[in-house]
Regions:
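N-terminal leader/linker segments that initiate helical-solenoid repeat arrays
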Residues: 23-75, 82-89, 93, 102, ...
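Conserved alpha-helical positions within TPR/SEL1-like repeat arrays
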Residues: 74-75, 81, 110-121, 146-161, ...
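Bacterial N-terminal signal peptides
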Residues: 11-19
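Residue-level detector of conserved catalytic or cofactor/ligand-binding positions
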Residues: 207-214
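Amphipathic alpha-helical segments of tetratricopeptide repeats
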Residues: 56-61, 93-101, 133-143, 173-183, ...
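Bacterial N-terminal signal peptides that target proteins for export
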Residues: 2-11
Length: 214
């Protein structure tokens, strides 16, 4: 015979189950954070300080093997760099570990690029160049032309510093192509400066005149 106490007991069991499910769900990256990540990424290039503010408000506490957490770590690395905030490699290592195992060329390229940036800042030039070159390969699979400009510029500058002028010019031309496709006027201007530096180092001064002509 079903009594009122049986209903109460069943209700208690259901409440406990729902509570456990809710707790388990909260340990995963909340889906509510996804729009915030998208918003931060959308304003990263023009308003990196605003992007950083959004990302700082998320503060996830979840396993690193989670796409949204890895995305947060990657974007936080990017935002801190753009805001000239000193950082360790702990966040980029999370992003790198995740995205190098998954089929997302843009995210992989971005993670490789910032691995290179942080290795370069810690005076490990060979490691940095290796990451940049791998990033340059990945970015060709995407239409993220702003990132393409940044990656190819870094490779070109490293080759220019080593006086490997032909290699530098190859990557500066790729950077210029990406800058034009991105329609970012600042990047276009810098791409001409980089090409001019390569021509100057090669002592091809007539070529400098040609690129300065409208």
């Amino acid at each position: 015979m079903i009594t009122m106490s049986s209903f109460k007991y069943a209700g208690l069991i259901i409440s406990i189950i729902i509570s456990l499910i809710s707790c388990t769900h909260n340990k995963n990256y909340p889906t509510a954070f996804q729009p915030e990540l998208a918003k931060a990424e959308a304003m990263m290039y023009r308003y990196p300080d605003s992007a950083l503010h959004i990302l700082q408000g998320i503060q996830p506490d979840i396993p690193s093997e989670n796409e949204q957490y890895a995305t947060w770590a990657l974007l936080m690395t990017q935002a801190q760099y753009k805001n000239q905030i000193e950082q360790s490699d702990s966040l980029i290592n999370i992003a790198y570990s995740y995205f190098t195992k998954h089929d997302n060329a843009q995210r992989k390229a971005l993670a490789l690029y910032y691995k290179g940036i942080l290795r370069h800042e810690s005076h490990h030039a060979e490691d940095a160049l290796s990451f940049y070159l791998e990033a340059a390969t990945e970015i060709e699979k995407t239409n993220d032309y702003q990132l393409g400009f940044l990656i190819n510029s870094e490779v070109g500058l490293m080759y220019l510093y080593r006086k490997l002028n032909d290699y530098a010019m190859e990557y500066f031309e790729k950077a210029h192509h990406n800058a034009e496709l991105s329609d970012n006027q600042t990047y276009i201007a810098f791409s001409f400066i980089y090409i001019a530096r390569a021509f100057s180092q090669k002592k091809q001064y007539l070529s400098l005149i040609h690129i300065s002509e409208p």
